[in-house]
């Protein structure tokens, strides 16, 4: 049978040793493709969330001097670290980065005022806004949209092909669309599940 396990850890390093595959909002990157194979199932960008009304006047184009919450092991954590380096190089105030093992902690940090903004994949931002019942709002629009995927042990073509066929069946028979609509994220729908799609 299938065993599932929800864990607050970096999943990709455990694919192929501890787990056969990982299902999360994995952003496909060339670097990650060196470690695992991917089957795309969704497209998502990145986004920011702030307290409703943006009381701290956060500007997404200038995060220097702010407290920014992110989830550990995400592309957003990498990106905010690069932004922080640029702030320092430009002689601006430092970004205080609050990395959390769970996204719920990053969300809570903004709701409680411990962080000015959180940075996450766009579906995560949308879900957090819905779950906090109006306490948060998205800052600006989604950006840098890329495919999200299921991660599978590198070179395990049998499992990779089985996952691709299963995802494609769900897309073709309408089940996938119904699931996305239920969660309010149908704007990220793909019509083709691809194995290791090209990324920029």
Predicted regions span which residues?
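Ligand-binding cleft/hinge of the Venus flytrap
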Residues: 76-99, 129-133
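Short beta-strand-centered segments that line the small-molecule binding cleft or hinge
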Residues: 11-25, 33-45, 139
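A ligand-binding cleft/hinge motif common to bilobed small-molecule-binding domains
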Residues: 25-33, 81-83, 111-144
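Flexible hinge/capping segments at coil-to-helix
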Residues: 51-68
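Hydrophobic residues within well-ordered alpha-helices
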Residues: 14-15, 63, 110-111, 150, ...
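Short, small-residue-biased leader/transition segments that mark boundaries at the very start
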Residues: 1, 5-7
């Amino acid at each position: 049978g299938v065993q599932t396990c929800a864990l607050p850890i970096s999943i990709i390093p455990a694919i192929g040793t501890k787990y056969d595959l990982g299902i999360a909002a994995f952003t496909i990157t060339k670097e990650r493709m060196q470690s695992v194979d991917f089957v795309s199932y969704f497209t998502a960008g990145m986004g920011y969330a702030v307290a409703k009304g943006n009381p701290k006047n956060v500007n997404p184009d200038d995060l220097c001097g702010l407290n920014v919450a992110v989830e550990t092991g995400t592309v957003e954590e990498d990106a905010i670290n690069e932004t922080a380096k640029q702030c320092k190089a430009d002689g601006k105030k430092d970004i205080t980065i609050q990395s959390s093992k769970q996204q719920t902690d990053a969300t809570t940090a903004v709701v409680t005022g411990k962080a000015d903004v959180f940075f996450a994949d766009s579906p995560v931002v949308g879900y957090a806004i819905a779950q906090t019942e109006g306490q948060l709002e998205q800052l600006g629009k989604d950006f840098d949209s890329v495919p999200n995927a299921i991660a599978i042990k590198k070179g395990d073509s049998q499992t990779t092909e089985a996952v691709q066929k299963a995802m494609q069946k769900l897309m073709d028979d309408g089940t996938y669309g119904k699931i996305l609509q239920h969660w309010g994220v149908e704007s990220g729908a793909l019509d083709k599940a691809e194995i290791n799609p090209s990324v920029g």
